[in-house]
Design a protein with these regions (language model features):
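Active-site environment of divalent metal-dependent phosphoester hydrolases
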Residues: 13-17, 41-46, 64-70, 93-98, ...
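Binuclear metal-dependent phosphoesterase catalytic core
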Residues: 2-3, 9, 81-82, 104-108, ...
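Residue-level detector of beta-strand structural context in well-folded domains
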Residues: 76-77, 120, 149
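Pre-active-site segment of Zn-dependent metallo-hydrolases
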Residues: 16-27, 88-106
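Helix-adjacent hinge/juxtasegments
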Residues: 54-96
């Protein structure tokens, strides 16, 4: 059975919040088959480096990203990995009603990866849509820790979703 190892990151804010990604995140990039980045890069140099170091990158731009990043990345990135349909976006709006809004907005998605809030999130809607926000590896805001997520896709199933502290 083929397994795909995933790294989920968002809101990296390099170099405003950190000069670079933490070493543990670069280690996770090296181990991942696919890196999913849900926007707010800030500078294109980080995109260049991640494109060079990741085996595969699926990414979108965020509200803090400028013209070059918006030219190079979509607002919404869709990919199917081993039978699981992923959508990567930056913003999903306010917390109240998020599941209902996202279910209506993304009817053909199995897993929605998002960012913006810097607040980790892992829920599943009544229809089975999985909502994942990995938090931020560089800017914890009101959270106790900076974070990122890893997961595995195998046999058309998302497995082993883990929130990691930086």
């Amino acid at each position: 059975m083929l397994q795909v190892q995933l790294l989920l990151i968002a809101d990296t804010h390099v170099p405003k919040r950190a000069k670079d990604l933490p070493a543990v995140v670069w280690d996770a990039v090296a181990c991942a088959d696919v890196v999913l980045h849900a926007g707010d890069w800030i500078v294109p140099e980080l995109l260049d480096e991640l494109e060079g170091r990741a085996r595969r990158l699926v990414a979108c731009w965020g509200n803090n990203d400028g013209e070059e990043l918006r030219r190079r990345l979509p607002e919404r990135a869709d990919v199917a990995l081993e039978g699981v349909r992923f959508t990567v976006v930056h913003e999903t709006g306010q917390t109240p009603g998020r599941e209902a809004r996202m279910t209506a907005q993304y009817p053909d998605t199995d897993v929605l990866v998002f960012g913006h809030s810097h607040i980790p999130w892992d829920t599943t809607t009544e229809t089975g849509l999985r909502l994942l926000n990995p938090g931020s590896p560089t800017d914890r805001r009101s959270q106790p820790f900076c974070t990122y997520m890893t997961a595995t896709v195998a046999d058309s199933t998302l497995l082993d979703v883990v929130l990691h502290r930086v």
